[in-house]
Amino acid sequence: MSKSAFTSKSQLKGIDGSFNDPFRQPSMNLPTPPHDDGLPSIPRSTALPNLSNRLSPYSHRNYLPIPEADSRNLEVLNSISLTTGSVVNQINKLYQRSCDNANYLQDLRSLILQTPTAEANATQVTESLNQIQKILQEASSKDREQIVQVIKELNKGNSLEVRRELGNCLAHLKKGTLNIDNALQASLQKYWKELQYFNVSKDKLLSLEESIKLLSARLEETDTPSSTHWIEINAGFKEVGDELSENFQRKQEILSGLQNNVILRTNNRKPVGSDGSNSNFNGGEEQMDSKDQEEIQDYLNSLLSVHEKDGVLLQKFHNSYVQYQKLAVALSKYENFDADKLFQQMNLAKQSNETLLQTLTEQTDQLLSFKETMDSFKFILGPSMENQALQQGILAEQQDLVAQLRDIVLRSETLAENPSNMPGSCLPGASSNTADEFTEQLNLLKNEVARLSAICPSPNSGINASVLTNADNLEKENLLLVNNNAFKVDDRSVSSVALDDHNRQLQMNVEELEGKKADLTSKINRLDKDFVKLNTTYSLLTDQVKTKQLALQEIESRVIRLEERLNMLQKLSMQPAISSSSEFVPIESHPSSSAVVPIEEPKNSIIEKKRVPHNAARNSVNLEVTLPNSKKRFSSFSGSSSKLPVRPSTALTDKRKPSWSRRLAAAIGFSSGSPEKKHVITSSDAGHQRSKSRSFSSKM
């Protein structure tokens, strides 16, 4: 767009549509933009006087009072034209690109939905392709052999038997071409049925919808190159759309400024003289005439119409961009993954973990209370002077037991704070081992307390008995709680193991689906390659059929030329016989003979004819035979003799060319000059025959 969009008055009027210019072109009938990235290069002209000349008559004194020195208005006009052209080209390019991308996405989606799953489909396709190739090879080999045989027979000679065989060969060749066409049509029909069968097989793919949902959900989590590509395309679309909006606003501002400038110059006009100097007229006193006002109004209307059309195109572009974005999002996500079942299982596991945590917290509180009771029991035991050493040893053992109990309590506290570190959360049966260990520790503690109470009696035995009773009760409650917790932990462990098995099964299903997807993709690629090979084979065979048809036409033309030569040779060989049979002996001289007897000529009287080519038959002078004046048979090749009747006048005006059927009949042997119809020719028949041969030879 090196030139301005408003370079002539006819183009400006063509935008508005209110003028009847037969040479104008529609403003929006733009060519298809090329699919290249980036904006088109817009070279700008720096020669403002040259631009002023190109913008005539709009910069003319009678239209707009813009002098050549006023470069600002010229730059405004130039920027308007360049911006309008670039925006239109950009809108066309982006609209075409969005249409192409939408069509490509539709084809890709249909291709994904039409992929076959069974291996029998691939085998059937390969069998059909092999059958098509076999049929085409057989037909081409047969045609090649027939053409070779025909060429060999043509090279042998030009006898009647060869002509008959040639006619049969031509018929067989035509029949062979028809058979080839029929075979191609049948094979293409069969392949079309196979494609329809592939379309039907998409119903089988719908049965794998749940598995594909899982796979699509997993693919959504990962950033694939395709999603990155779509994101880049959408970002590019958004940038171009923003730039288009900015250009649109800029053009609107320029148009408003131009309109204000035109209004100001209309109100304050200074006419320019013929010498280029401004005349001393007061501004505003000299009003424009009606013609200039109409032209300025048309100019503004044309600009506003272009502005409105650009707005409509921008709206269409935004609509297509939104549709394309929706389509890209739908294709990248494929289908939304419904994970209600998995979320429900996760919620159940979370609730079970919370219940287990609460139970462990309660158990920890009970163990802490039991610890406090045991600490108080240690100080209740009074010292005895007699058994002080024994009591000290028992107290040491008791301290060890209390330390072990503290370890158990600390372990339960850590499990309550962090249930994930629990041994039974991953392995079934580990919780039962922990419960057994805890029970053994409690039993050992109970036995030691009983032994201490038996060895060291004290006046506070009632208190000790109550403490032991409370300890037994607490022990029983703890045992019940531990057993209940063990069962719960076992149940949770079993459920976690089942959940792990289910997750592994889902992982295996996903891997299997990925393998199936890879197989389907490879099958689709193979089918595409086979289809391309079939198309190339079909095009090659079509070219071979065309070449064979051309060869047949050439053979037919050669046959026609050979038949013409044969007819000429036959007529040349029959003319002496016709002329000799036309000279009858008068009946008066031979009254005794009832049959017509031709005059016998001595062999010495006939002088050998001059050999001439058959193309010289049109010139009757070249075919004169040198005979004596008394026994001269022909005056020319036309067969006109002094003793024979003259050719009818109708033969002179007969300019028709013999048809193909007559030539074929003459070539086969059913013409009047063939050996099957030889008879005694009368003088009238001979004359008629000579007239026909002359007319035919003259037209050859």
Swiss-Prot record:
What is this protein's function per UniProt? At the onset of mitosis, forms a medial ring structure before the arrangement of the medial actin ring. Essential for the central positioning of the division septum before the cell divides.
Localisation: Cytoplasm, Cytoskeleton
GO biological process terms on file: mitotic cytokinesis
Which classification does the entry list for the species? Eukaryota, Fungi, Dikarya, Ascomycota, Taphrinomycotina
Q: Which organism does this sequence originate in? A: Schizosaccharomyces pombe (strain 972 / ATCC 24843)
Q: Where is the composition biased (Polar residues)?
A: 1-11, 43-53
Report which residue ranges the record marks as coiled coil.
496-575
**Gene Ontology molecular function, alphabetical:** cytoskeletal protein-membrane anchor activity
Name this polypeptide is given: Mitosis inducer protein blt1
